[in-house]
Amino acid sequence: MVAPSKKALVTGGAVGGTALVAAGVLAFSLLPSPPEIESAPNAGHPLCADIARNYPRQLLGENRTEAKGEGVAVWGDSAVVLRCGMKPPKPTTDLCLNVNGVDWVLRSDASSEGEGGSKSKKTLLTYGRDPAVEVTVTAEAMTAAGDTLVDLGDAVRAIPQKAKCI
C-alpha cells in the first residue's frame, strides 16, 4: 500500500474545508431573517433605550425575537410588535383603557383590515407618556391583549405619565 503524498493530503483537506464552509454559509442563509419593522419617529429617545432593558422575554407564550429597527421589539412571529418613540396622541374619543397604571388608547384608525374585511391587527398606544409606546397585536393574540399590556406595564411605566385618559 502506498501512502498518500503531502500534496494529496493538503488538496483533500482544502477541498473538504471549502465544502464545509460552503455548507455553513448555505445553512446560515436559510435561517429566517429578523423582521424589518419601521422605527417610530422618535425611536432614539433615551427613555426608549431605558425601557427596552425591561421588556419581558416572553409574551403570550411567545419568545422575544430579534427585530431590525431602533426602538422595536417583536414576540413570536410578529404576534406582538412594540415600537417606542411614537408621538403622544392628543385627547381622543377612542376607547382608552387603564391597565395596571398605564393608559392605552385603542387606535381605531390604525387597525388593519384582513381578509373578508375582518380586523387582522389591533394597535394600542400609550396615552399621556412622551415618547409614546405603540403595541400592535394580531387578531389571534387579541383575545389575550390584556395579558400583553399587563406584562409590558412594568417596562412602560418607566416613561413618566403626564396626562390621563378621560
Task: Outline where the language-model segments fall.
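Generic solvent-exposed, charged/amphipathic alpha-helical segments
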Residues: A52-R57, G153, R157
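N-terminal signal-anchor transmembrane alpha helix of single-pass membrane proteins
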Residues: G16-G24
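N-terminal export and membrane-targeting signals
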Residues: M1-G16
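Extracytosolic low-complexity repeat regions of secreted or lipid-anchored proteins
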Residues: T93-I166
